[in-house]
Amino acid sequence: MVNLILVGPMGAGKSTIGRLLAKELHLAFKDSDKEIEQRCGANIPWIFDVEGEAGFREREQAMLSELCATDGMVIATGGGAVMRDGNRQILRAGGRVVYLHASVEHQIARTARDRNRPLLQKPNPGQILRDLMDLRDPLYREIADVVVETDERPPRLVVQEILERLRKLPPR
C-alpha cells in the first residue's frame, strides 16, 4: 500500500490522527520529528538551538526522503516540512498527502503549554501561528490530495473522513 502522509500546522492532530489511521489500516506509523529525535539522541528544541532552523531542516529532508522511500506507512510530518521545495517533491512522490487543517485559534489552544515547539518559545505565539499559517497554508494545499478540517472534531471522525475521501481518489 502507498504511504499516507499527513501535513499541516502544529496542533492540527497529525500524530494523534496518524496513529489512529495506522491502527485502522494495519500499517506502521512514523512521526518524522520523533524519528529525527531518536536518530540524533536530542530533542527538536536542542537541535534548533545548536544547529539552527537550517540545520534542522537538513535533517528533516534526509528523514523524509528515507521514510518516503518505503511504502506501507502512515507518516506524520513536522509543520514546517513543506517550506522546502525539495521536501514538497519528496512528499508528493512518497504517497497520498492529507492536509489536516486547523484554525489558528485551535492551534493556540492545542499548543499553549507545549514547550517542545521552538518556534513558539517567543513573545506572542498567536501572531507567530497566524504568520506561519499565512505562509504555509498555500504550500500544504499545493501538495495535498485531500484537505480535512480538524477543528471541533473527534479524531475518530477525522480518520473516517480521510478514509472515505481517499477511497474516492483515482489510483496513482
From Swiss-Prot:
Mg(2+) binds at S15. Transmembrane segments: none annotated. It catalyses: shikimate + ATP = 3-phosphoshikimate + ADP + H(+). Its EC number is 2.7.1.71. One of its GO terms (cellular component) is cytosol. Binds 1 Mg(2+) ion per subunit. It is found in: Cytoplasm. Pfam families: SKI. One of its GO terms (molecular function) is shikimate kinase activity. PANTHER family: SHIKIMATE KINASE (PTHR21087), SHIKIMATE KINASE 1, CHLOROPLASTIC (PTHR21087:SF16). Monomer. Belongs to the shikimate kinase family. This is Shikimate kinase. It comes from Pseudomonas paraeruginosa (strain DSM 24068 / PA7).
